[in-house]
Amino acid sequence: MGNTIRALVAFIPADRCQNYVVRDLREMPLDKMVDLSGSQLRRFPLHVCSFRELVKLYLSDNHLNSLPPELGQLQNLQILALDFNNFKALPQVVCTLKQLCILYLGNNKLCDLPSELSLLQNLRTLWIEANCLTQLPDVVCELSLLKTLHAGSNALRLLPGQLRRLQELRTIWLSGNRLTDFPTVLLHMPFLEVIDVDWNSIRYFPSLAHLSSLKLVIYDHNPCRNAPKVAKGVRRVGRWAEETPEPDPRKARRYALVREESQELQAPVPLLPPTNS
């Protein structure tokens, strides 16, 4: 259904698109899914709220900045996609949808999340990437069943210690933030399987060898002078990731300094000879 709608509205002027979509949605879809992604919506079509058995609702890539209270009638909703819209605040009605398992909020203009988000105790996956977050909202630490957290491309400088409460968390994506140190709280979360801190400003990585569940760590595009130590079988993606054993930190520091000086002087600098250690 969603693909059909998108194919049709591509040929409809923006000022007529909203009315067309409303008329098209006359019956409850058999698959209990409505996909209005990329439909140029500026307001939510209220008729959708009559589909009380709806399980999946995709509103990605529109021009929405609010949602009506009638959305709260969709109490069977498990997946809600609001990414790539114009939300500056999360509509309170979203926090009343207590069956939500997956919530996509990426690529909006969110600076915080409401405390009422803690009511979504069935939430397993939360995407809040590419917003305006300068710190991870405390309410995220109250989502006890959360398994996947995507908070990349924000302006995070650190993570709250309360994050360790999320003992079901398995994957955390933090790429493209402003981390200058590896978040200490992650060292106390042995249940994590995937850690992504790509594109930050981390200069030193502590050992991650004690994280017994870890399967993948992505640390590329950091000004680091060492690679994180990991247990056998854990995949690393970043500088020195394929070297075994891990490079001598002294040699790594010397290499990094030479490279930095070379870039500053904009002239080639010979590599230092290896030490005998």
From Swiss-Prot:
MF GO annotations? actin binding; alpha-actinin binding
Annotated Pfam families? LRR_8
Q: Specify where it is mainly localized.
A: nucleus
Q: Which GO terms describe its cellular component?
A: cytoskeleton; mitochondrion; nucleus; sarcomere
Keyword annotations for this protein, in alphabetical order, are: Leucine-rich repeat, Nucleus, Repeat
Q: Name one GO biological process term.
A: cardiac muscle cell development
Cited function: May play important roles in cardiac development and/or cardiac function.
The identity of this protein, by name, is: Leucine-rich repeat-containing protein 10
Organism, as annotated: Homo sapiens (Human)
